From Swiss-Prot:
It comes from Saccharomyces cerevisiae (strain ATCC 204508 / S288c). GO terms for molecular function: 2-dehydropantoate 2-reductase activity; NADP binding; translation regulator activity. It is found in: Mitochondrion. Present with 2140 molecules/cell in log phase SD medium. One of its GO terms (cellular component) is mitochondrial ribosome. This is Cytochrome B translational activator CBS2. Keywords: Activator, Mitochondrion, Translation regulation.
Length: 389
């Protein structure tokens, strides 16, 4: 990277938010107080951060001892120039499990987000991206440079006492990133750029965009974070390639996790033994593919579309996942039992939202969405009712 370090603003309450901020701070060209600004929820949280000596602390997952810390700049309001005007945010990384929180915070910083702003949504739900595209940045001329990034694994650690991070992962994290330069249109009207022109533009952006340069530098870091050896392997994709990958993952998860919860399964393999479950899975797949086809007709122009989103292929992937990962716990069912928030709105809720928006059939996904929300409600009611204690 050049000697001019781009300032990066970091927004969100996830372990990945802190981990990525720490890695950016470790770049050799960073000053003692790194050019990273944490955007905290409100003034109260900012005060608590300042009372914590403005530090993010990394603790060992084995003995809870501090292994590393770093001081950061922080704020809870849009940046202000010396003349009192709101300053632009050039680079923003957003990572939080709550889509509602993200949309509310983006509204808060709206005047700082310009067409030249780079915004990376890290491990976002497709529901969030669709909402932002449909309601917030519908027109190209007003839209910032949007990126989406997905990591494997997604769950890298746990946050304790707001500013303490315990890392679960050691080793290499796969980091997949793409510029959202062609979010699928809701109609087949309008011409998209030719593949050759799009390819040339993507190549130029990969070489010159500040985010790509930044993450290439991060992927070259070999130092650990305290005693934890954590590094990123960077993979840069075209938008549709990464979108297809995440859409496929979403279909697989939304066809199994809600059913596992409805049937009170503990392990994924149990779904294979339940009579009629496979028929429901087939109906869900068929409905979801129909919703995608109706909602995003422009995707049909991709030569891989009909192969990737073939009904039989998707069903085979679902069955294989239940067999190969059958020993793993049902995540959504576990969240329900632990009285935690579920991601049902990001799963079947995505297809229900699309289906209702495009006025096409979404009854199977809507039924599952209703069942899980009802189960979540009654589970919490029972936990609060002394008759069940």
């Amino acid at each position: 990277m050049s000697s001019s370090i781009p300032r990066v603003y970091s927004l969100g309450n996830s372990a990945m938010t802190y981990l990525l901020a720490l890695r950016i701070a470790q770049l050799p060209s960073q000053p003692k107080v790194p050019s990273v600004v944490l955007l905290l929820n409100d003034q109260k949280k900012l005060n608590r951060f300042l009372n914590n000596d403005s530090k993010i602390i990394v603790k060992s997952s084995n003995n809870n001892k501090e292994t590393y810390h770093r001081q950061f700049m922080a704020s809870c309001v849009p940046p202000i120039l010396s003349n009192g005007e709101i300053a632009p945010i050039e680079n923003l990384i957003v990572s939080d499990p709550s889509s509602k929180f993200i949309t509310a915070q983006l509204s808060k910083y709206n005047k700082s987000l310009r067409p030249e702003t780079n915004i990376l949504f890290l491990n976002p739900s497709l529901n969030l991206l669709e909402h932002l595209h449909r309601y917030r940045w519908r027109f190209d001329e007003a839209r910032p440079n949007l990126f989406m990034g997905f990591t494997t694994p997604v769950d890298v650690g746990t946050i304790h006492q707001e500013f303490q991070l315990s890392l679960k992962v050691k080793g290499r994290i796969q980091f997949h990133i793409a510029k959202i330069d062609g979010f699928p249109r809701m109609s087949s009207t309008g011409k998209s750029a030719s593949l050759s022109l799009r390819g040339d533009r993507q190549k130029n952006e990969k070489e010159n965009n500040a985010f790509y340069k930044l993450f290439r530098e991060i992927s070259r870091l070999r130092s650990g974070i305290g005693s934890d050896l954590v590094s990123f392997d960077l993979h840069v994709h075209g938008f549709q390639d990464l979108f297809f990958t995440e859409l496929e993952k979403l279909i697989l998860e939304s066809c199994t996790e809600p059913l596992l919860a409805v049937y009170d399964c503990v392990y994924k393999k149990e779904l294979l033994k339940i009579p009629g479950a496979q028929d429901i899975i087939k109906k869900l797949i068929s409905e979801q593919l129909s919703i995608i086809d109706r909602s995003y007709p422009s995707l049909n122009t991709n030569p891989n579309y009909s192969v990737i989103f073939d009904k039989e292929r998707i069903f085979s992937l679902v069955m294989r996942d239940l067999e190969v990962n059958g020993h793993k716990r049902a995540k959504l069912a576990q969240s329900l039992n632990q009285l935690n928030q579920t991601n049902i709105n990001e799963l079947n809720g995505f297809f229900v939202s699309l289906g209702k928006y495009k006025k096409c059939n979404c009854k199977w996904n809507d039924i599952l969405l209703t069942l899980i929300k009802g189960k979540q409600f009654i589970t919490k009611q029972k936990a609060l009712d002394y008759h069940y204690l």
